[in-house]
Amino acid sequence: MRKGILCVILGCFFSILCHGQVSFGVNASITSSTLSENFAKSKTGIQIGVLCNYELNEDLTLLSGLGYVVKGVNGLWSDLNYSQQLKMFDVQLSYLELPLSLGYKIPIGNNIRLIPNVGIFLSYGLHGHSEIKSINFEAEEVFRFADNSWNPFKDEKFNDWAQTTVNAFERWDYGVRSGLNIEAGNIICHGAYDLGFNKVWNGYGKMGNALKSRSLIIGIGYKF
């Protein structure tokens, strides 16, 4: 149901673009992402893409574009903590992402304006990488298992540790976005926070809980 509503909204947006004044640009950002669970630790990634904005009137603007974004999560395998040697689960996820936000333009100087904005985002997982790191507290060292990397968009079963299955991440993600842009001429500085609605990961086998994505984005762009 939510996916259908998002598709309708995006379809209306692109129909508007065909009949109005549109500006384009490019941007690059740093991301910090995690999941909605206490064990999850944030992971730093990047985002690069194109901007596509539509001026509704003197006060309102639609902000959109298309980007390649790298997200992920770090966290301890607390469910499998049988000894002093823990296993750390690292995930890197790459998405094609389409945001759509409504912004309100606030002039604060000569050709400078603030644009607080709220909207939605829709992402599709292209590829990813997962691996387990071992933390040996007695030796105070961290080392990687060479044979324990896999595609996080597919289920992975480990027979060595209580026949544990790491469930696949969902490729589709969507949710709400709130942000703030600062435009100075053709330069755009932007920040946003994404709150995912889709349950992108169900954890380990039947033991896990459905988790949702959380992302902080800070970047800079140039409008042609």
Regions found by a protein language model. Name each.
Residues G20-L51:
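Short glycine/proline- and aromatic-enriched beta-strand/turn motifs that initiate or cap beta-hairpins
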Residues T34-N38, S83-F89, Q163-V166, N202-G208:
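Extracellular loop and loop/strand-boundary signature of outer-membrane beta-barrel proteins
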Residues S42-I46, Q92-L98, I112, W172-V176, ...:
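Residues that define the transmembrane beta-barrel architecture of outer-membrane proteins
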Residues S36-K43, N74-N81, G128-N136, W201-K206:
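Outer-membrane beta-barrel translocator domains and adjoining extracellular loop/strand segments
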Residues L76-W77, T164-V166, R171-F224:
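Predominantly the C-terminal beta-signal and adjacent terminal strand-loop region
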Residues V22-F24, D59-L62, I112, N186-G191:
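Repeated loop/turn-to-beta-strand initiation elements of outer-membrane beta-barrel proteins
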Residues A40-M88, L93-L96, F224:
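Glycine- and aromatic-enriched membrane insertion/assembly motifs of diderm outer-membrane
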Residues V26-I30, I48-Y54, L66-Y68, L98-Y104, ...:
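Residues on the lipid-exposed face of transmembrane beta-strands in outer-membrane beta-barrel proteins
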